[in-house]
Amino acid sequence: MIRVSAGVVRRADGKILICKRGEGRKNAHLWEFPGGKQESGETPAECLKRELQEELLLPVQTGRILCTEEKQGILFDFVYAETAEKPTLTEHEAMAWVTPREMLRYTFCPADTDVAMRMALNDPPLKNFLWDFDGTLMNTYPAMVQAVIRAAEKQGMHPSAENVTRLMMHDLRHCVHTLAVGNGGDEEQLYADYRREEAGIPPEDIDVMPHMAEALQTLKERGGRHFLVTHRGEDAWRYLEYQGLRALFDGGVTRDDHLPRKPAPDMILHVMRTFGLCPEETIMIGDRPLDTEAGRRAGVLSCMLDTSGRFAEDPAELYAKDVENMMGLLCAEPLIL
């Protein structure tokens, strides 16, 4: 089996060297931890020293193997190293010195992605989890869509469930506005009728997202704190209580706190001020771009929990297709340098 040494090279200020693969190479234009193939008889450290001298004219002092990963039939030894010298580009098209957390801004080669993530999410470890409600914690959309349809029918509109769902994935207000304008309806009346229909949705009609209850409990047991950040009213707490999840939350904000709606950062900033949360230890998790944008604008990490499969291009630092995928990211074994 082919074996490769990849260098986690750190300089005195704590920043780590990453390099961008050049045109014509496999995984061109993606970032990597520099290194190369081990030759017969070489140790991982010896290989790394040779490769970094050849590729970057960079002398290093090597240390321990941080971890070994197998990707596509190749073993990658990630070797810790230190340097006080300046690298020179010879094969790569770019390089950067970054903090572990800054690695989340870069797209890495498949072999390097997990290692970069394990370092980035523990610099420092995440402790505070801010949750959207509708479509994130609870699968409320089927009931909400039917509430919109019933409200629209009072004005003679007959939107399809598919169209309402598509519009709601942007924002409820956007959905109501689009339906009213497109059908000559009264927007404010439609919104008011929807709210009345929504208020009548019984808790037993709302399901927890698959594996979400276990995820909340696991993060809590690992020392995490949960906070609600939702456009829904105080009934969100009632639904959480019904599902036995209310006690897992330290607090949060709802529509009834009368703060500007996401993607404005105000709701998140209010929670952070109220509970004294550190931005570097906080992440906003939601299922729509307005949630992740609110997180970015508030200066915290964001995770797109895209169970609908609609937002794969969202610029959130983390992307998960389902709750299990999300937990694989949030609970990955930390890589300590």
Specify the residue positions occupied by each region the protein language model found.
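Asp-based, Mg2+/Mn2+-dependent phosphohydrolase catalytic module
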Residues: 127, 217-220, 233, 238-337
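Conserved Nudix-box catalytic region and its N-terminal flanking loop in Nudix hydrolases
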Residues: 15-55
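Conserved phosphate-coupling serine/threonine residues in phosphotransfer and NTP-handling enzymes
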Residues: 136, 229-230
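N-terminal helical cap/lid subdomain that shapes the substrate entry/recognition surface
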Residues: 126-213
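Conserved N-terminal beta-strand and adjoining loop/helix that marks the start
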Residues: 1-16
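Unchanged
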Residues: 38-122
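Short, acidic loop-to-helix structural element flanking the phosphoryl-transfer center
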Residues: 200-228, 265
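Non-catalytic pre-domain segments flanking phosphatase-related domains
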Residues: 118-131, 336-337
